[in-house]
């Protein structure tokens, strides 16, 4: 699920934290990728007539096709991917997982009804909601990655937390995930849309956590408290507390301890749920179960791909076309066998700003944030006008 509305808050209040660009801009970088999130996106995106792709034996192949070709695209663009798989979920996440299961059961019922009486759009909508990453999907993707020569790690718990550890240690440039809670785990840089298909033409989003904190004028603890208020995988949001209110509450009161205390005293008009262990949720963001960066499992390297092994697995066992798999495997072999040119930024160290420069920079960020808010407001106003305009009028 990630953090509800966090990207919108960052876009409006800390726009300088977000950079967008083409995938080729990530050339020469090592990136730790949230594998489960990627596999889920492959299962949803790689489809035909609203259904996941299958081979002649009825086995699902969407995840393998996505993993092979999207990884190949990254390697073609000079990126060295490392996939990180989820381990056992924290106990506090069990409520969210139960809700996801319930939603999928409801979606299955909706899908059956849509197939009988609904439109193609209804079938597609409910079909996507039934998607679940299974243990078999994970195991098959790990087998594929091994044959491709691409390293992977199985995290003790949350993959995003493990990605953040590797990014902080400098073992990778960034963590890549669609889940915004990666920032809560203190990954210096989050890349989004990295594993999207080229056809979607979505730019890569590069979000810098230091600039997020600077733009929001918060320390990390306040930022995590904001994310918990917005609603995360560990806790539901407090009823009637939306993104604007959550931001206002943190800015005015500074911490969840103060906010919750005032709510319980009736000084704030919101009601805290009876079981709302925000301290435990915060602790999971600050002290997740992860392998330290110097752990043996974190010593990874990219190997030469097993071309014949890939052909046997994808073509013979999974029914892929050899005319597509073999050239792809050979491209992978060539790309991974080429020593990559180092990025220029690796030769230079950043120079610290003076107090005056910091002050001027902060003011510049405030002006940019204000301009972004005005632009967003104008866009919303224009959309509302267009929606209200009668059809057939210019």
From Swiss-Prot:
GO biological process: base-excision repair; DNA replication, removal of RNA primer
Localization in the cell: Nucleus, Nucleolus; Nucleus, Nucleoplasm; Mitochondrion
GO cellular component, one term: nucleolus
Residues reported in the UniProt entry to bind Mg(2+) 2: 179, 181, 233
Region feature (N-domain): 1-104
InterPro entries: 5-3_exonuclease_C_sf, Flap_endonuc, HhH2, PIN-like_dom_sf, XPG-I_dom, XPG/Rad2, XPG_CS, XPG_DNA_repair_N
Top-level EC class as recorded in UniProt: hydrolase
This enzyme's EC code(s): 3.1.-.-
Region (I-domain): 122-253
Residues where DNA binds: 47, 70, 158, 231, 233
Keyword Iron: no
Gene3D superfamilies attached to this UniProt entry: 5' to 3' exonuclease, C-terminal subdomain, 5'-nuclease
PROSITE patterns: XPG_1 (PS00841), XPG_2 (PS00842)
Function: Structure-specific nuclease with 5'-flap endonuclease and 5'-3' exonuclease activities involved in DNA replication and repair. During DNA replication, cleaves the 5'-overhanging flap structure that is generated by displacement synthesis when DNA polymerase encounters the 5'-end of a downstream Okazaki fragment. It enters the flap from the 5'-end and then tracks to cleave the flap base, leaving a nick for ligation. Also involved in the long patch base excision repair (LP-BER) pathway, by cleaving within the apurinic/apyrimidinic (AP) site-terminated flap.
PANTHER family: FLAP ENDONUCLEASE 1 (PTHR11081:SF9), FLAP ENDONUCLEASE FAMILY MEMBER (PTHR11081)
Assembly notes: Interacts with PCNA. Three molecules of FEN1 bind to one PCNA trimer with each molecule binding to one PCNA monomer. PCNA stimulates the nuclease activity without altering cleavage specificity.
Protein name stated in the entry: Flap endonuclease 1
Species of origin: Pyricularia oryzae (strain 70-15 / ATCC MYA-4617 / FGSC 8958)
């Amino acid at each position: 699920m990630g953090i509800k509305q966090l990207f919108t808050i960052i876009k409006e209040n800390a726009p300088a934290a977000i950079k967008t660009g083409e995938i080729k801009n990530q050339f020469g970088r090592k990136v730790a990728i949230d594998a489960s999130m990627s596999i889920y996106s492959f299962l949803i995106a790689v489809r035909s007539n609203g259904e996941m792709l299958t081979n002649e034996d009825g086995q699902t192949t969407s995840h393998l096709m996505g993993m092979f070709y999207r990884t190949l695209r990254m390697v073609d663009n000079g990126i060295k991917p490392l996939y990180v798989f989820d381990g056992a979920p924290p106990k506090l996440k069990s409520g969210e997982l139960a809700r996801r299961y319930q939603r999928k059961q409801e979606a299955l019922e909706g899908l059956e009804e849509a197939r009988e009486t609904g439109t193609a759009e209804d079938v597609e909508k409910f079909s996507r909601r039934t998607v679940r990453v299974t243990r078999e999907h994970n195991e098959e993707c790990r087998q594929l990655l091994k044959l491709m020569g691409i390293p992977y790690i199985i995290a003790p718990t949350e993959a995003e937390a493990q990605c953040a550890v590797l990014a902080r240690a400098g073992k990778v440039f960034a963590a890549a995930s669609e889940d915004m809670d990666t920032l809560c785990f203190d990954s210096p840089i989050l890349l989004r849309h990295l594993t999207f298909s080229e056809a979607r033409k979505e730019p890569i989003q590069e979000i810098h956590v230091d600039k997020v904190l600077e733009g929001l004028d918060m320390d990390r603890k306040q930022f995590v408290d904001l994310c918990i208020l917005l609603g995360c995988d560990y806790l539901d949001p407090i009823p009637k507390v939306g993104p604007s209110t959550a931001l206002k509450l943190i800015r005015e009161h500074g911490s969840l301890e103060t906010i919750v205390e005032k709510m319980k005293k009736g000084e704030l008009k919101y009601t805290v749920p009876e079981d709302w262990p925000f301290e435990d949720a915060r602790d999971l963001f600050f002290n997740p179960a992860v392998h330290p960066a110097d752990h043996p499992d974190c010593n990874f390297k990219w190997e030469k791909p097993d071309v014949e092994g890939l052909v046997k697995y994808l073509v013979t066992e999974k029914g892929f076309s050899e005319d597509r798999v073999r050239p792809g495997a050979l491209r992978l072999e060539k790309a991974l066998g080429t020593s990559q040119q180092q990025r220029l930024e690796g030769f230079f160290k950043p120079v610290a700003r003076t107090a005056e420069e910091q002050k001027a920079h902060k003011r510049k960020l405030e002006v940019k944030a204000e301009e972004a808010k005005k632009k967003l407001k104008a866009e919303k106003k224009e959309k509302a006008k267009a929606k209200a305009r009668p059809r057939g009028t210019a």
